[in-house]
Structure formats: C-alpha cells, structure tokens
C-alpha cells in the first residue's frame, strides 16, 4: 500500500476513535464509530487475497449490524428524553440495546464468532490494530454509560466470554486465533468489573493492550504465525523466543508476571462487592487460558520439532528490523506486578 494513503487511513482511524471518546453528542459518537469502521477496512485488506477479503467482509457486516443497533438505541433515547447529550441518563431499554451493540463491537460472547475468523484472515500488523486500538472506542462508551448498564446482562456476557475465550483456544495451533480467543477472555474480565469500578476496567484495558502489543510485535519480528514456526525461531533468535514464551505466560495470568495483576485486582473488587460465585467461576475458567498458554510454551521450548539442517544455520543471518522499542515494552509486560500497591492507591 502507498505510504501516503496508509498514513491518511491511519489518521482517519485515530480521528474516528478520538471523536467517539471526546464527543458529548450521541450523533457524533455514531459518526466516529462509522469513520473508524470504514477506515480500517483497507487496513484489513492490505494484503490482497481471498482470506483477507473474507475477513474484511465479516468485520464489515458485524460492525454494520452493531452500528445499526447503536443508532436504534440512540433514537429510542431521543424519543424518551428529547436530548442528544451523552450526559443524559439512559432508560433501561436504551441501556440494554446499547450494551448489546457495544458487546458486538468488542467481540463479547455471544457475539464473539467474528473475532477469531477475522483475526486469522489478516496480517499480524492488522491483527494488532484490530485487537488493541479498536477496543478503545467501545470501551470508552461502555465507561460513560456504566451507571445505567444492566448488571445481570453484562455479567452473564462476561462469564460466557471468559469461558469461551478459554475453551476456544484449547485446540488451536494458529497464533492469531490463540490471541483472538485470549482477547475475548480479557474483554470478559474487563466488562465484569465495569459496573462496580469502571476505572479499574480502564486500567486493565491498558495492561491488556500493553501485553497484546508486545506479543504481536515479537511475532512480527520473527514472522511467526503458527506453533511450528514459533518453535523454529529458537535457531534464529533464542533470546527473543524465550521472551515470547514469558509473554504468553503473562497473558495467561501466571504470577509473578504482569498478566496476573488484572485478574487479581478484578477478583478483589468483585469480592469486595459481595460477589463470590462470579469471581470463583471466572478464576476456574481462567485456568483454561493458562493451560493452553503453558501447553504452547511446553511444545515450543521443551520439545524440538523435526527440522532440516539448513534451519540450524538461521542464527548466522541477523535481522535488519529495528528492535529498540521492544525492551521497555517487554519489561512493562512482565514486571508490572511490584507496582500493584501504587496502582491500587490510584483508584
């Protein structure tokens, strides 16, 4: 893609998200979502092939349906209140429809089916944008309407998302699908605490984006998309491959890595609010995520796949890609846990 066109498209994606996050008018929020959706379609189709075309079509149909539901909710709210302001309290019907629309945009269960399929059909760089930046706009609106959200609806979707995010990733060998199911599970954790403590949900979103960005960047550096190709990177960049495995354990939520912090804080917040069954179920289903990450770590580090002799010479060829941005990201993605007392004071 032409760099000038790509920069214009990326600027439109950023502008659309910022419009959603800063608007106090519901129509401008909807326009921001539409700008963002239409601008990201060329990014998804950056590598022109049938898989990317199919992925972009699935993404468009899902997001268009979600936008239609969002406009329906905005219209009902306008009929009831006569105001376009986002600061105006929502009535229960509007709140339910808007929550469903945002859940579809985020990929929460039972609207999660598009996330693994779309992520698998696009490039790693496009997948990074899809699973990180594209979560900001819906989460910001969810944050704004959090006092009016139907708690039972959101908690049920959260529990289903955590469970499906764990079950779905168990049988996968494609790294992009594993990251997609991990994203579904993380969204479930964030939305579970949204009605109790929205600020904590945003803090967890930041940690999730940090972990996912670092993992995707290491995949892009090694050009790895499957478990098999990940195991072959030992010959080329052994230190970076070790880092990838630690990052995956962090994404799975294994202490004392950074990924354990969001789960710890969310379980603590839910138990403070006399919710015992929900965090118990979430903690048990989180073991599924940890299991498939540990299995992936085991299969790539402790077992060697068959490889031809010329694979053993990969270490002689240095990568020309810049890696200066990776060390600080890796440190933050693995060693944030000691900062937890300070982060808890910020709430």
Curated annotation (Swiss-Prot):
Recorded hits in InterPro entries, A to Z, give: Complex_I_Subunit_2 (IPR050175), NADH_DH_su2_C (IPR010933), NADH_UbQ_OxRdtase_chain2 (IPR003917), ND/Mrp_TM (IPR001750)
Q: Per the annotation, which location comes first and is thus the protein's main one?
A: mitochondrion
Which reaction(s) does its UniProt entry say it catalyses?
A: a ubiquinone + NADH + 5 H(+)(in) = a ubiquinol + NAD(+) + 4 H(+)(out)
Does the keyword Nuclease belong to this entry?
A: no
Membrane spanning segments where? 4-21, 26-45, 59-79, 96-116, 122-142, 148-168, 201-221, 242-262, 274-294, 326-346
Q: What is this protein called?
A: NADH-ubiquinone oxidoreductase chain 2
Binding partners and assembly? Core subunit of respiratory chain NADH dehydrogenase (Complex I) which is composed of 45 different subunits. Interacts with TMEM242.
Membrane topology for this entry?
Multi-pass membrane protein
* One of the protein's GO biological processes: mitochondrial electron transport, NADH to ubiquinone
UniProt lists the family membership as follows:
Belongs to the complex I subunit 2 family.
- Per UniProt, which keywords does this protein have? Electron transport, Membrane, Mitochondrion, Mitochondrion inner membrane, NAD, Respiratory chain, Translocase, Transmembrane, Transmembrane helix, Transport, Ubiquinone
List the GO terms this entry assigns under cellular component, sorted alphabetically: mitochondrial inner membrane
This chain is encoded by the gene named MT-ND2
Q: Which GO terms describe its molecular function?
A: NADH dehydrogenase (ubiquinone) activity
Q: What does this protein do?
A: Core subunit of the mitochondrial membrane respiratory chain NADH dehydrogenase (Complex I) which catalyzes electron transfer from NADH through the respiratory chain, using ubiquinone as an electron acceptor. Essential for the catalytic activity and assembly of complex I.
Its EC number(s): 7.1.1.2
Q: Which Pfam families match?
A: NADH_dehy_S2_C (PF06444), Proton_antipo_M (PF00361)
According to its UniProt record, where is this protein located?
Mitochondrion inner membrane
Q: Which PANTHER family does the entry mention?
A: NADH-UBIQUINONE OXIDOREDUCTASE CHAIN 2
């Amino acid at each position: 893609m032409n760099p000038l066109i790509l920069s214009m498209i990326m600027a439109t994606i950023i502008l659309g998200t910022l419009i959603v996050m800063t608007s106090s008018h519901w129509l401008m929020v909807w326009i921001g979502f539409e700008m963002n959706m239409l601008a990201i379609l060329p990014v998804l189709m950056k590598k022109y092939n049938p898989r990317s075309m199919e992925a972009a079509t699935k993404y468009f149909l899902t997001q268009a349906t979600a936008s239609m539901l969002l406009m329906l909710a905005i219209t009902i709210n306008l009929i009831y209140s006569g105001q376009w302001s986002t600061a105006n309290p929502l009535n229960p019907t509007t709140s339910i429809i808007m929550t469903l629309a945002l859940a579809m945009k985020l990929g929460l269960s039972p609207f999660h089916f598009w996330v693994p399929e779309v992520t698998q059909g696009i490039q790693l760089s496009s997948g990074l944008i899809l699973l990180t930046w594209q979560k900001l706009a819906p989460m910001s609106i969810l944050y704004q309407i959090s006092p009016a959200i139907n708690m039972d609806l959101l908690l049920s979707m959260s529990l289903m998302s955590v469970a499906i995010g764990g079950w779905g990733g168990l049988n996968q060998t494609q790294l992009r699908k594993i990251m997609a199911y991990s994203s579904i599970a993380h969204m479930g954790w964030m939305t579970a605490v949204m009605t109790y403590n929205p600020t904590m949900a945003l803090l967890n979103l930041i940690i999730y984006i940090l972990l996912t960005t670092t993992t995707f960047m290491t995949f892009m550096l090694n050009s790895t998309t499957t478990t098999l190709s990940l195991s072959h990177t030992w010959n080329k960049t052994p230190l970076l491959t070790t880092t990838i495995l630690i990052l995956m354990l962090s994404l799975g939520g294994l202490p004392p890595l950074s990924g354990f912090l969001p789960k710890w804080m969310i379980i603590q917040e839910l138990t403070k609010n006399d919710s015992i069954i929900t965090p118990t179920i979430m903690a048990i289903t989180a073991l599924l995520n940890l299991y498939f990450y540990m299995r992936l770590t085991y299969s790539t580090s402790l077992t060697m796949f068959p490889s031809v002799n010329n694979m053993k010479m990969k270490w002689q060829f240095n990568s020309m890609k810049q890696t200066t941005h990776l060390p600080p990201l890796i440190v933050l993605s693995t060693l944030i846990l000691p900062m937890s007392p300070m982060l808890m004071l910020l709430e």
